[in-house]
Amino acid sequence: MNFSLHRQIIILLKSNLSLIRKIILYVVCFGLLYSAAEYYFGIWINDKREYIPLLIRVMAAAVFMGFSIAVFEGYLYMSFRKKPFLLIVILRSVSYSAIITFWLIVINGIWESIDNSISFVEGVVYYLQSEAYLVNLVTLIVLFIVILGVNQINSLHRKGELMKFILGRFHQPKEIEQLFCFIDLNHSTTIAEKLGNLRFGSFLKDYYSDITDAIRYSGAEIYMYVGDEIILSWPVTGKTNYNKVLSCFFMMKETIRMKEDVYMQRYGYVPEFKAGLHGGKVLVTWVGELKKEIIYLGDVLNTASRIQGECKRMGCDFLVSEYIKDKILDPEYTIDFADELVPRGKESKIKVYRVVDATSN
């Protein structure tokens, strides 16, 4: 699998599909609640025969507005993700207002023209002069600001962590099965000494930003940043795609390879990294009072870290445990036995395997 620009675009599109579905779902739910309120309380309509037409308009607006805003968010992410937060807020506010106004006018203009047997332009004028237009516009703008505000707050936490806290998950320690991948930047001390603290900080920021799409595509949770090391995590379920988990590492490699000229021009160094992947039973729970956080405890993390630490000695970039190797059935990857090692505090050895992309050039 040779991850080209084509593959990077596919990754971005698939990431945005998730956003599109989420926004459309939120707006559809709001639309249903609004329609139900109209039906039972008659806020704007008194004739219940108008309920179905209203529901049709609400659903159409939800789909078109949701899709348009999600596409805009994808563009915003690509072009402005490193810009100041205030600039992004202003762009969102102006763009959302324009998108919402456009679809309100188009959908209701068409409906009024059909319902009153008038032209589309007359239907638009009729709708703009109604009290419903201003109420709909303000309500929808506030709704989208709330949705994206919650999404922005959620981005400050790990994937799904805010919802887990709200639902009360893991407030009591619980044993679950989880995958962990430790990814460590090579020669970070040397690079930091050569670049200095500020430029090395920018180097790390660009590196973490550039590998984000691969992480998102693989469905990983960023468990922790530890200086120049990043720890990724995946829940183990019946639907776990282990090939997609492995692909995260190779997508990250290819993303950096495609931008190596930019890194060389800007910093004189290109990020290189090694990774160790392992999985198994861990204990998960919320901890802390001043700062609440979900933590994972168990030998699985220590073993994954040890596997990553052996990459240099074994002369390879990506090592996985036998636990992972036994679950990979696709010939997309070549997995060869590398060595046995004894995790810290353990007596029994575990087998580790090097992973190579079988279809790369």
Question: Language model features by range: what are they?
Answer:
Residues S68-Y77, F85-E131:
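Hydrophobic transmembrane alpha-helices
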Residues N46-A60, V89, E122-V135:
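Membrane-interface segments at the starts/ends of alpha-helical transmembrane spans
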Residues P173-S247:
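Catalytic NTP-binding/metal-coordinating core of nucleotidyl cyclase/transferase enzymes
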